[in-house]
Amino acid sequence: MTNDTLGLYGPEDSRYLNLVAHRAEAKGIKTAWVDGPTPGCVAYVADTDAGWPMWDLTPEEDVDNIQHPGLSCCAAVVLLCMRYIYSLPRDRRVCIIGRGHAVQWMYRVMRCYSYEVDQCSSTALDMAYLVSRADIIVNSADAVTEEVLGAVPASATVIDISGSMEPLSDRVADYVPRDHVGRWNIAELLRRVRVRIEEEGETDG
């Protein structure tokens, strides 16, 4: 059996997984809704917000690094955005809000790139202070307070993974909305899946 299908794990009304399925179809990548390990699946993607328990994935199947160390697709595209699209200098101070899958390994990699980085949980009491001194804010918190929004410098670049800083869209120097990050995230996911399919094809050959 050829392993050339991306397994979708989560509620079938998941907006994220349905977007993945739609964009995968446009790129000629097969998808299937699954509830466990499935013959023919080369990789799996899950709606991590759904909180469904998962079986153990191999590193090869886990293209989004849900269970394994490494950059998630979202974290990878945010780094690409900072380095190449916006050409943000490395001497800028970055504040990462949240510690979940969306920003997985981002702190570690940014430190390797010589950024000054602060990271806090989405409920940190000192969040307003941390954002007030940041040049770049990467936000993955589901909600932020008015105090935090008010502390964001007008000169800042905000990369808004979750969308909870949307009120700042016309109040900061640069604002990257949730939809943009989401499109890049899915593009990176499908790129990784395509690599896995090609690797499987070489093995079968």
Region annotations inferred by a language model:
Residues A43, I137-V138, I159:
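N-terminal Rossmann-like NAD(P) cofactor-binding module of classical short-chain dehydrogenase/reductase
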Residues D4-R23, T31, G70-E147:
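Glycine-rich phosphate/diphosphate-binding loop of Rossmann-like nucleotide-binding domains
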